[in-house]
């Protein structure tokens, strides 16, 4: 395959694994500076591989953690995969743009959601966000002041705070762990 081939279900991109040569932002903006918009560490497939080879790390991010979505491209900002093992956790956005917060973890299958679902502001010029690793549960989400969309799993008791705007909640029974 060529270096721009995103593979089956578009899973061959660095949004889902650092081992990919396909930069998630290159198709959207080939002139994007290399100082932001990249994956910042191991992504869903990388984390699943490490867990398979070395076992789970039950004490990693085991407290109450907050993951903040921002809407300004800055040096060092990009995409991360959340690996969190315990606690009451929150994904939050404190801005005025529309935001999509997806609480579904990666299902590590060759299908949509295999590498995770992206939580980010609804702006094609902002290259910052999160996916959630397989087996990780994020309990809560808080949106911004605009019309937000939340994706949640029916079997998880989430607390969703939409703040202002006309917000949507999409329920899924897709909890493939």
Report residues per predicted region.
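Extracellular repeat-rich scaffold modules on cell surfaces
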Residues: 97, 105-163
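Stable alpha-helical elements in mature extracytoplasmic
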Residues: 15, 43-49, 134
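A broad, low-specificity signal marking well-ordered, structured residues that form hydrophobic/aromatic
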Residues: 17, 80, 99-101
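GD-rich hexapeptide-repeat beta-solenoids
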Residues: 10-12, 21-29, 51-74, 88-124, ...
């Amino acid at each position: 395959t060529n270096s721009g081939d995103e593979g089956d279900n578009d899973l061959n991109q660095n949004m889902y694994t650092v081992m990919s040569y396909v930069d998630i932002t290159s198709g959207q903006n080939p002139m994007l500076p290399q100082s932001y918009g990249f994956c910042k560490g191991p992504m869903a497939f990388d984390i699943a591989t490490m867990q398979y080879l070395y076992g789970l790390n039950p004490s990693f991010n085991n407290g109450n953690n907050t993951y903040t979505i921002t809407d300004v491209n800055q040096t060092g900002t990009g995409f991360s995969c959340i690996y969190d093992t315990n606690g009451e956790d929150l994904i939050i956005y404190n801005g005025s743009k529309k935001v999509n917060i997806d609480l579904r973890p990666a299902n590590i299958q060759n299908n949509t959601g295999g590498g995770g679902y992206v939580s980010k502001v609804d702006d094609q010029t902002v290259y910052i966000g999160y996916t959630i690793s397989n087996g990780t549960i994020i309990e809560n989400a808080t949106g911004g002041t605009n019309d937000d969309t939340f994706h949640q799993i029916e079997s998880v008791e989430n607390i969703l705070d939409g703040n202002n705007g006309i917000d949507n909640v999409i329920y899924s029974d897709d909890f493939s762990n």
